[in-house]
UniProtKB/Swiss-Prot annotation:
GO terms for molecular function: ribosomal large subunit binding. This is Ribosome-recycling factor. It comes from Wolbachia sp. subsp. Drosophila simulans (strain wRi). One of its GO terms (biological process) is cytoplasmic translational termination. One of its GO terms (cellular component) is cytosol. CDD domains: RRF.
Length: 185
């Protein structure tokens, strides 16, 4: 029973960590990264396609991305999707390739990005604590219904807190790395 509680806690918190990781991956640092365009969705073929399903994104140098579009007929839609993504990017079309020269980040922009990172981190911490609360309530009910003993309850409580603390440390560690990356480039 305790192993199930532990596994459930880890699984739910891992999803939160992965979501946080995806959120911060899309935040621009001073260097070009193909992951910057991961969230872009293109309206083509009567539906929505992720950019990486209609084109290959590669990094040319620290400040330039190249997008090789497989179907030349959708170049305009891809360009519009990039423009509408609110990433402050200026795509330049060259045949079936789009080049994006990333502008330098101003100090003000860097500070805004760091603020956004902190917001993502706080949301992830809150989600982790909410998961802890939910699991603790479930464990408390199990104790009240005599499904687990008092000792097992206290052991589970400690284990859940340890898992929570470790996941919050992971969030803080990723935040610190990304923050340094933004401020130092």
């Amino acid at each position: 029973m305790l192993n199930e509680i532990k596994a459930k806690t880890k699984e739910r918190m891992l999803k939160t960590i992965q979501s946080f990781h995806d959120d911060i991956k899309g935040v621009r640092t001073g260097r070009a990264s193909a992951s910057l365009l991961d969230g872009i969705v293109v309206n083509i073929y009567g539906g929505h396609q992720k950019l990486n399903q209609v084109a290959g994104v590669s990094v040319i140098d620290n400040k330039t991305l190249s997008i090789k579009i497989w179907d030349i007929n959708v170049v305009g839609e891809v360009k519009n999707a990039i423009l509408n993504a609110n990433l402050n990017l200026n795509p330049v079309v060259e045949g079936n390739t789009i080049r994006i020269a990333l502008p330098d980040l101003t100090q003000e922009t860097r500070e805004k990005l760091v603020k956004l990172l902190h917001q993502f981190a706080e949301n992830a911490r809150i989600a982790i604590r909410n998961i802890r609360r939910d699991i603790m309530e479930e464990t408390e009910k199990m104790k009240e219904n005599k499904e687990i003993s008092e000792d097992d309850f206290h052991g589970a409580k400690k284990e859940i807190q340890n898992i929570t603390d470790n996941n919050i440390k992971k969030i803080d560690g990723e935040l610190s790395i990304k923050e340094k990356d933004i401020l130092n480039h």
